[in-house]
A protein has these predicted regions:
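Active-site Asp-x-Gly
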Residues: 200-201, 208, 212-253
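Protein kinase catalytic-loop region centered on the HRD/HxD motif
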Residues: 193-200
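Conserved hydrophobic/aromatic beta-strand scaffold that supports enzyme active sites
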Residues: 38-40, 98-100, 201
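ATP-binding glycine-rich phosphate-binding loop
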Residues: 21-40
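A cross-family kinase active-site recognition segment
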Residues: 110-173, 199
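ATP-binding pocket architecture of kinase catalytic cores
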Residues: 43-137
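ATP/Mg2+ or Mg2+-diphosphate-binding catalytic cores
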Residues: 156-162, 262-292
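Juxta-kinase regulatory segment immediately upstream of eukaryotic protein kinase catalytic domains
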Residues: 1-25
């Protein structure tokens, strides 16, 4: 996120690091990414994940534990979380969960700089690896009532912030399309469920922003989306990959779109100030709705 969280101080994070990982002398907020907050603390990269709607505290802990298992199994491209002194991977703060990974020496490539052979090799290795015990399975992000509930929510004005009405009217204008997307999504999700025996470990969002090119090769970061799922979940940005099932590719394009719409609806129907993150979120909402 571009803006510092108003609900968590640097001092609180420093105390948590000293208690659960290691003492640090300084900390700096990093205005990177979208959806989570990040800090640099010496050799540590610190993340605050706000749990809902993707996770509970227990499911996030389990997901990061599974990530560590994949790294221990020999997947060198997995940037795994650093365990606490107690062996856990997350620490609750009351406003989310803190986790820590090593601060990597490298950079994320632009979209046109992605080393496709390297990311394809990494994904192939991941998909061939037996899933760790207890790794969560992918589940639909939008249920049968999603479109109708959203239509009802957007039928009355939102007064939650300066961009609330822009978001509401954008969503309301695409109600029929959202219903079509939702119906098709549920049809494809049922098809995927009927093939559960072929599901594999998937990263979920292995796009360029979650790739870091280091002197030792490609590393994949941000594993909170790790789940057992159809392999097509990992190929949204690699559509020409041979052997992909077009229906499963369509499923995960819709999965992304509908989950984004749900999160943006929650975002703008809640109090907000119109800061840089809010502006970026509104642009993202309009893009997902096909409004330019």
């Amino acid at each position: 996120m571009r803006s510092r969280p108003s609900f968590l101080t640097d001092e609180t994070i420093i105390r948590a690091l000293a208690e659960h990982w290691q003492p640090v002398s300084e900390i700096a907020y990093l205005p990177w990414g979208f959806g989570a907050h990040h800090w640099r603390a010496g050799s540590l990269f610190v993340t605050l994940d706000q749990l809902e709607p993707r996770h509970t505290a227990a499911s996030l802990e389990s997901t990061y534990a599974s990530t560590a298992e994949l790294a221990a199994a020999g997947l060198a491209f997995v940037c795994a979380p650093v365990p606490t002194r107690s062996g856990r991977f997350t620490v609750g703060t009351g406003v989310g969960a803190l986790s820590v990974t090593p601060m990597l020496d490298g950079r994320s490539p632009a979209e046109d700089e992605v080393d496709k052979p390297a990311i394809l090799a990494a994904l192939d290795a991941l998909h061939r690896t037996p899933p760790p015990a207890g790794l969560r399975e992918w589940a639909p992000q939008a249920g049968p009532g999603f479109a109708d509930e959203l239509r009802a929510r957007t039928a009355v004005p939102w007064t939650s912030g300066p961009l609330a009405e822009d978001a509401r009217t954008a969503l309301a204008s695409r109600g029929d399309a959202i219903k079509r997307w939702n119906d098709r999504y549920l049809e494809l999700a049922a098809l995927a469920a009927s093939r559960r025996g072929s599901w594999v470990p998937t990263h979920g969002e292995p796009h360029n922003d979650n790739q870091v090119v280091t002197p030792d090769g490609l590393r994949l970061v941000d594993w909170e989306t790790l789940a057992v799922a159809p392999r097509e979940r990992d190929y949204a940005d690699l559509p020409g990959t041979p052997g992909l099932d077009p229906e499963m590719t369509e499923l995960f394009a819709l999965d992304w779109r509908l989950s984004e719409l749900r999160e943006y609806a929650d975002w703008f129907s809640a109090p907000h100030t119109g800061n840089e993150d809010d502006v970026i979120a509104l642009e993202g909402l309009r893009e997902e709705l096909g409004l330019g």
